[in-house]
Regions:
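Short, charged hinge/linker segments at domain and secondary-structure junctions
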Residues: 3-26, 80, 114-146
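C-terminal secondary-structure termini that scaffold catalytic or DNA-interacting sites
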Residues: 31-32, 164-174, 221, 255-259, ...
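Hydrophobic (often cysteine-bearing) scaffold residues that line and stabilize catalytic clefts
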Residues: 35, 39, 43, 56, ...
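Basic, Lys/Arg- and aromatic-enriched nucleic-acid-binding interface segment
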Residues: 92-110, 118, 125-206, 210, ...
Length: 420
């Protein structure tokens, strides 16, 4: 009071000053904490709120956890620069030779940073802009990488050879005594072998095929309905099954018809008697991986993967035409239709492509091309049946040759099973 200051007011000022100091310290701590947020934390935030894919982002997470997060996951976002991203992607595109994967991941990194630039607290940590934009696609691949759409088409000889390989591997494996099968070359699951011919005969994508349910397959009418949710274009499709394609589905039904799914997921662990059938389909890439695992000469792997095949049993034409994939079957079937004179607009509809042209045309023109598509699928099926019947003929010749001690080969030069 001697200084003319009310003690109560003085205490209030001190309390206010103390509170302001605490708030300032807390704000400073929060600022420092935000500044130290890691790339992994930004990635997790993006997965939760910035991107949504059909598989629940599982493939996206798997790719980043394998190739990006081990290198920069624990690094503060503000310290991650283009050289960090470039180095991580080069390990994929150059060291591993997976150029397409590296370029896809670069695109995903750009998406991640575009999302972060407009959201707190990330935008303050990337105030200088997206480092992913400073990485060029050509910088993460080898010099001989050919950037473009695959154009691999299987020849008639390769289609025939593929069938012969399947038959030979299965026959050889099943003829082995039970105790010796572990060391033998195990064929693909029969379901996936059938999937190959279904995809080739119908032009359907691998993911669409793996999701098929028996309720959508009418074996009596020879029809397969693909709901919009299962197609890439989100447009439903009715496939008219050729006799060739129908035979594949009929055999498949003997294997999996007791489940809702044409390609059911394998139950984990030991299956108990009376257990419920699988309640989901196999992973969309299950068959694709099985095909790739059997062409390892084209894969940049240092060794075999756990519980995965690691051989060259499905390499075609001695590998001279490179790796083949399941998506190549779709291209092959379309090309065969084209060679047989099927109009391109009918092929587009058989492949369920999103059709070009003005919306008004699609709005007013409603012919469903059912007869044209049925005829196209039937012609393709007849051609495939002819190819495989030639394979069967070559087997008969091989058996006669073996009886005379002759050495018999296929049209592609491959020695048939049992030939001397």
């Amino acid at each position: 009071m001697k200084q003319g200051v009310n003690p109560n007011d003085h205490k209030k000022v001190q309390r206010i000053d103390s509170r302001l100091e605490v708030e300032a310290r807390l704000a400073d701590a929060r600022r420092h904490e935000a500044e130290d947020l890691t790339f992994r934390e930004m990635f997790e935030a993006w997965l939760a709120d910035g991107v949504s894919r059909e598989d629940g982002n599982a493939e996206l997470r798997r790719a980043f956890e394998r190739d990006v997060l081990p290198a920069i996951g624990d690094k503060p976002v503000r310290l991650v620069d283009d050289s960090d991203l470039r180095a991580a992607l080069r390990r994929v595109g150059r060291d591993r030779g997976a150029g397409r994967t590296a370029q896809r991941m670069l695109s995903e990194l750009r998406q991640l940073y575009r999302w972060s630039l407009s959201r707190k607290p990330w935008r303050t940590l990337v105030a200088d802009g997206s480092p992913a934009e400073l990485v060029e696609a050509r910088q993460v691949v080898n010099d001989d990488y050919e950037d473009g759409i695959r154009d691999r088409v299987l020849s008639d000889a390769e289609i025939r050879e593929l069938h012969e390989i399947q038959v030979r591997l299965r026959s050889t494996y099943e003829s082995l005594p039970a105790g010796h099968r572990y060391g033998g070359v195990r064929p693909m699951k029969r379901e996936n072998e059938l999937a190959i011919w279904i995809m080739l005969a119908t032009l359907c994508r691998a993911g669409e095929t793996m999701k098929a349910e028996w309720k959508d397959v009418d074996l009596q009418k020879a029809e397969w309905f693909l709901p919009a949710a299962n197609t890439k274009t989100k447009v439903p499709m009715l496939v008219f099954l050729s006799p060739f394609a129908l035979r594949q589905f009929e055999e498949l039904h003997l294997l999996t018809g007791h489940t809702p799914w044409c390609f059911p997921a394998r139950p984990s662990g030991r299956v108990r008697e009376g257990a419920q059938p699988p309640d989901r389909h196999v992973h969309e890439k299950s068959a694709s991986k099985q095909v790739g695992d059997r062409q390892v000469r084209f894969m940049s792997r240092e060794g075999s993967l756990d519980h995965r095949k690691h051989d060259d049993s499905l390499v075609l034409a001695n590998g001279e035409r490179g790796v083949w994939t399941l998506h190549d079957l779709r291209r092959t079937g379309g090309t065969l239709m084209q060679a047989m004179g099927v109009p391109l607009d009918v092929i587009d509809r058989c492949q369920n492509h999103k059709l070009p042209g003005p919306k008004v045309r699609r709005h007013y023109l409603h012919h469903d091309y059912a007869n044209e598509k049925r005829a196209a699928w039937n012609r393709l099926g007849q051609h495939l049946a002819t190819i495989l019947s030639a394979a069967a003929t070559s087997k008969q010749v091989a058996r006669k040759g073996r009886s005379r001690g002759a050495r018999t080969t296929t049209a592609t030069g491959q020695v048939l099973a049992g030939a001397e």
